[in-house]
Amino acid sequence: ERLIWDDESVFGPSPNWGDWRNGPGVDARVREVLEAAETLVRDRLAAYGRGAARYGLIHADMRLANLLIDGGDTRLIDFDDCGFGWFMYDFAAGISFMEEHPQVPALREAWLDGYRAVRPLDREDEVEIDSFIMLRRMALLAWTGSHAGTDLARSQAPHFAAGTARLAEAYLA
């Protein structure tokens, strides 16, 4: 059975990776900001909708760690998170754990250019990428709590909640 990657799978009663409120470093200030971001993400994605041009089968973990590059050929691996979600969510998954990196705007433009080479995007698709980045980041905050024993989660734990709050503040502005 394929996973679902939507607001319910991150914020609902049975989230895929646990409750973001249980992530390391989530204090009262972080919780307040992220609860406001959660509300806005839910509202914006409800308005965005799940039409066939926006929602379907996605990889959901298209990070650099899951690309094999051989000369001019690139292959995508690791389909365990593959499931149903918004197509634009794949960009957010692609920048997992590096959402605050200064190269993200350039990566975003390159990804959009590549996407447009295959199929058209409307303005709303591009605008809502920020909602998908916030959705994914909050899912990852939950993941750092539910996967606390992994090296990646341990390396992210000291700063991830505060960084997520910074992203949320920018998203809410």
Predicted regions mapped to residue ranges:
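A cross-family kinase active-site recognition segment
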Residues: 1-32, 53-55
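Phosphate/dinucleotide-binding and metal-coordinating scaffold of catalytic cores
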Residues: 11-22, 84, 103, 128-130, ...
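ATP/Mg2+ or Mg2+-diphosphate-binding catalytic cores
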Residues: 21-25, 29, 140-173
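Mechanochemical coupling/switch segment within NTP-driven translocation systems
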Residues: 32-46
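Hydrophobic packing residues in well-ordered alpha-helices of helical domains and bundles
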Residues: 34, 38, 108, 157-164
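Active-site acidic catalytic loop and adjacent metal/ATP-binding pocket
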Residues: 42-89
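Active-site activation/catalytic loop segments of kinase-like enzymes and analogous catalytic loops
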Residues: 87-120, 136-152
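All-alpha amphipathic helical-bundle segments outside canonical DNA-binding/catalytic cores
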Residues: 121-133
